[in-house]
């Protein structure tokens, strides 16, 4: 059975690179009818944040990635790690190192002066003397002294690290807390993880973890190291580029379906297909197909995908989603016309809510450029004729309002723009927006009259 995991540290927000890693792991487990584990790597007690843990769980809930069993917390597993550290000490595969931080710093300075790579010199590896007084030792694992550590990466191919590049790394700090590479290997083995899909910034942690697996005789999982997401200039993604808390995307009005679709395409593809439902991703995804090179974050692509998903979201669902953006339409009798008119134009839910408010709320002022462009010639007479015909009608459907505009165009023998521009300015306060007939049907006959009369009153003598 395929078992994957996502193991964030709760020291900061979950950003989109992390969510992409989680998605890849989730897809591979679900495709194969396997298990997907969520593990919180909270051994760094000083830097952990309860808020960050909460935000990770909230993000998973929002995008709809479910996990199997309870969330695993490393901080609750210290007894397990201590047992395995003791096992390595008892078997002579690990040892206490009494070198102080000051001694280590001095050693590194001397090595750098000699042009050597700074590293621990293994002086306590086979130590049998009397330990120095007053030093709390760390525990180091005995790494191989020669040969190569070789593993096959599902994306990068065969990876070889020379043993001489690694020192006897610390597996327990002087306060007894275990270190990252040790606990990751223990947890992955004990949780039955078969496939580790993670960012390639972890590539050089892998040989250390393999040393732990081999020292304890534990099974080694398959590894897939995913290239980073870069900005459009090929540099590391910053917050300004989009490397922000996943929940910020929700606040900006992105749909989870769009974000997941966007992320799966950052580094993975299936022919020329761009739109993928979660079910399609599950059926088609294979980590072996992930690109070897880094992918570029493209905001316009995310907006294009989000617009697609908004357009295809049922109005009933949109009404509920838009409440988070201060737009309450459940009791509005023209909500269907409103949403149908706007969801073709919106890139985010925030945009959709803002556009709806621009229609539902009468304009407080008028765009200056629009005034200069639209309010010239006989605009006032044209709008007065429009009002006369509208007041005499019982217009309520878009087609009713459209017919009145057509009648004015015909009677005045003018182009559509001669009425369309001043009318749009009256209704919306600006020159761009959805179909005028839809706008009037949404706000109704009386409100249309009020807005047109207001423009004539304020600008008719200027």
Swiss-Prot record:
Catalyzes the attachment of glutamate to tRNA(Glu) in a two-step reaction: glutamate is first activated by ATP to form Glu-AMP and then transferred to the acceptor end of tRNA(Glu). HAMAP family: Glu_tRNA_synth_type1. InterPro entries: aa-tRNA-synth_I_cd-bd, aa-tRNA-synth_I_codon-bd_sub2, aa-tRNA-synth_I_CS, aa_tRNA-synth_I_cd-bd_sf, Glu-tRNA-ligase_bac/mito, Glu/Gln-tRNA-synth, Glu/Gln-tRNA-synth_Ib_cat-dom, GluQ/Sye. This is Glutamate--tRNA ligase 2. One of its GO terms (biological process) is glutamyl-tRNA aminoacylation. Belongs to the class-I aminoacyl-tRNA synthetase family. Glutamate--tRNA ligase type 1 subfamily. Monomer. It comes from Nitratiruptor sp. (strain SB155-2). Its EC number is 6.1.1.17. One of its GO terms (molecular function) is ATP binding. The gene is gltX2. PANTHER family: GLUTAMATE--TRNA LIGASE, GLUTAMATE--TRNA LIGASE, MITOCHONDRIAL-RELATED. Pfam families: Anticodon_2 (PF19269), tRNA-synt_1c (PF00749). CDD domains: GluRS_core. One of its GO terms (cellular component) is cytosol. A motif ('KMSKS' region) lies at residues 236-240. It is found in: Cytoplasm. Keywords: Aminoacyl-tRNA synthetase, ATP-binding, Cytoplasm, Ligase, Nucleotide-binding, Protein biosynthesis. Its main location: cytoplasm. A motif ('HIGH' region) lies at residues 8-18. Disulfide bonds: none annotated. It comes from the Bacteria. ATP binds at residue 239. It catalyses: tRNA(Glu) + L-glutamate + ATP = L-glutamyl-tRNA(Glu) + AMP + diphosphate.
């Amino acid at each position: 059975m395929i078992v994957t995991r996502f193991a964030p540290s709760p020291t900061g927000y979950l950003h989109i690179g992390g969510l992409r890693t989680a998605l890849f792991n989730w897809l591979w487990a679900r495709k194969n009818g396997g298990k997907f584990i969520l593990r919180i790597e909270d051994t760094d007690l000083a830097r952990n944040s309860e808020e960050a843990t909460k935000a990770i769980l909230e993000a998973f809930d929002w995008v709809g990635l479910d996990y199997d069993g309870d969330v695993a917390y490393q901080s609750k597993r210290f007894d397990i790690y201590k047992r395995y550290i003791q096992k390595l000490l008892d078997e002579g595969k690990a040892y206490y190192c009494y070198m102080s931080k000051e001694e280590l710093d001095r050693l590194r300075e001397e090595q750098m002066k000699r042009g050597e790579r700074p590293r621990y010199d293994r002086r306590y590896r086979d130590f049998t003397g009397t330990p120095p007084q007053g030093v709390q030792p760390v525990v180091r694992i005995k790494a191989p002294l020669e040969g190569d550590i070789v593993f096959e990466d599902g994306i990068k191919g065969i990876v070889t690290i020379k043993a001489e590049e690694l020192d006897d790394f610390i597996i327990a700090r002087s306060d007894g807390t275990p270190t990252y590479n040790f606990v990751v290997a223990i947890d992955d083995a004990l949780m039955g993880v078969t496939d580790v899909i993670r960012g390639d910034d972890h590539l050089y942690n892998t040989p250390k973890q393999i040393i732990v697996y081999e020292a304890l005789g534990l099974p080694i999982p398959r590894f897939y190291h995913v290239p980073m997401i870069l900005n459009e200039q090929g540099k590391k993604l910053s917050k300004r580029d989009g490397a922000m808390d996943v929940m910020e995307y929700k606040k900006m009005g992105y749909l989870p379906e769009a974000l997941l679709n966007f992320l799966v395409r950052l580094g993975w593809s299936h022919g020329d297909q761009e739109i993928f439902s979660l079910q399609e991703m599950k059926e088609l995804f294979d980590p072996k197909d992930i690109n070897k090179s880094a992918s570029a974050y493209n905001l316009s692509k995310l907006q294009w995908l989000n617009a697609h998903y908004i357009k295809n979201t049922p109005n009933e669902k949109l009404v509920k989603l838009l409440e988070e953006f201060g737009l309450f339409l459940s009791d509005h009798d023209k909500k269907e016309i409103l949403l149908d008119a706007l969801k073709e134009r919106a890139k985010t839910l925030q945009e959709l809510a803002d556009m709806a408010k621009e229609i539902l709320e009468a304009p407080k002022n008028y765009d200056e450029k629009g005034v200069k462009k639209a309010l010239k010639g006989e605009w006032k007479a044209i709008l007065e004729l429009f009002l006369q015909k509208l007041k005499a009608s019982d217009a309520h459907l878009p087609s009713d309002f459209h017919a009145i505009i057509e009648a004015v165009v015909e009677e005045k023998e003018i182009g559509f723009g001669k009425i369309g521009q001043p009318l749009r300015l009256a209704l919306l306060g600006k020159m761009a927006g959805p179909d005028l007939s839809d706008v009037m049907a949404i706000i109704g006959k009386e409100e249309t009259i009020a807005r047109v009369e207001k423009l004539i009153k304020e600008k008719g003598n200027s």
